[in-house]
Amino acid sequence: MVLPNGGRSTFYKNSADGKFPIESIFMDELIPFIDSNYRTIASREGRCIEGFSMGGRGATRLAMKHPHLFCSLFCQAGNVPRLLDTFDAATQEERETMLLGDQRKTWEADDVYAVTQKNKDEIKKNVRIKIACGTADAGHLLTIRDFHQHLTQLGIDHTYLEIEQLGHNRTQMMSTFASSWFDYHVESLKLARPTRQR
């Protein structure tokens, strides 16, 4: 298990100014380092991703953007906004101060809705998806429901759970899934193995 720190408010993306290349560090440096220095299954079949809140948002985007690298995703209360809507509503002056800068193509490359649409066939084939959020998590539930609908419309199979009266609370989220937390990924790893190895 690897628990990387993505910094504050990076959402696990590369900043437009190059100061915070978080996604590149994770994808191009961290994963190869782990696979080179530890006994791993150095492929999608041996790799899962998950996170809570900003970590859930980042995990979701990375899994949808790089479906060849992960066999499962568990997003817990990760806000899933439509980035292109934010870009289109902003003024040029506002865009210049934002993490992703003022180029629409950069935002499109990091918009989870756009990359899910683009990679839908590979996602359907490769990535097992589980999403959970509390019904009292007002700041995140609406976008998570929106993404759930997006996956449904694209025909991407996934497990979607709303936990009654749960707010944005990592400890309570962990308690809710305590008995099955790792079972989900273990099952995903088993399902991802080639048939001859099962």
Spans of model-derived segments:
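Non-catalytic cap/lid and distal C-terminal segments of serine-dependent acyl enzymes
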Residues: 1-198
